[in-house]
Structures are given as structure tokens and as C-alpha cells.
Amino acid sequence: SNDGFRACDRAARQLLGKRSSSVFPVPPRLALAPLTYEEINLASKAQCGKGVSKQAFYLLPKIRETEALLRSSYSDDLDWLETHPELCFSSFNGAMPMEDNKKTDAGFRERKTVLARHIPARTIERLLRDLMASVPRAQCARDDMVDALVCGVVARLDAAGRDCLPPGGQEFDEVGLPMRICYPIPTGSQ
């Protein structure tokens, strides 16, 4: 969005409670320009009254890539869903946010346990082992791999198995792209 504020992000933070900081503010659309961090940060402060986090800045190449694909003719053939891993884990955990930080050993185990309700544990272990052997840690940490797996599980759900934020409707950004976060209907709510 032009201002970096999205109702779906606010709603996700509310649902995540103590894990709400995992939904960090998206950068405003101006950040898609190929500028330095300092230039983007200053422009964002001038336009929106807030800067851009380093975490968001480092995601910009992937955001640009996704934006280009969503705005291409290929997007007509795809059913795109935005999701958030912590919201997915929380939902698969009975709408209870994860207890431990995903970067810790306990948090990693906790997320694998929740995933094992939807993917056989041996499959999870094989996938993680193969990924860790083939992808440099500097490019993808183990917690990011588990995040990708939970997002893959959600992508396979049909519409009856998921809900979207914000509740009661969908926002669109200035170029017509949907601003929504899809997540599994919490376990026990189906």
C-alpha cells in the first residue's frame, strides 16, 4: 500500500498476542524503487511518518519479484494466497500462539510438533534434512524452512479449511492487488 498500513496485518497482530511482533509493518509502495536503505527510510518517513525496518528492507527483492509476478499476465492462471507462518502455526495449535521463539531449539521443536499433525513426522525430517543439505544456512535458516512447510500445508487447504483477514472483507492496494492474509480455520473450530 502507499502508506504501509494494512488492516490484515493489524488483525493478524491481534490474533497472535505475544507473537504479534512477528507481523512487522510492510514497507510502503515507494520502497519498491531500487534505492538504498537510507533513501527508502527517509522517503518513507516523509510520506508515511514512519521508517522502514531493516528486516523489511532485506525482503524487498522478494517483494519486488512477487509484485512483478502478481502484475504479470501469468497471475491470471494462479490462485495466489498470502499467509503468515506464525498465524498458521497458531491456528493449527487451536488458536494458541506458539510458546517459544521460532529461532530457539524449543521453538523449532514446537513448530515441528504442530506440523506433524498435518505432515508425517518422517516426511518433515526428510524434507528438512534435504533442505539443510542443499540450501546454505545464510540463504535460509531452519526456522524459515519450517515456516515454508506450514505455508505449503495451508496452500493445499480448500476454501472451507481457511479464513482470511481482515474479517468481513478484503482490501485492495492502489494497483488493485488484494491485501489479505489467509490462514487455516483453527483446529477444533471446523
What is each PLM-predicted segment?
Residues 1-190:
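RNase H-like (RuvC/DEDD) metal-dependent nuclease/polynucleotide-processing core
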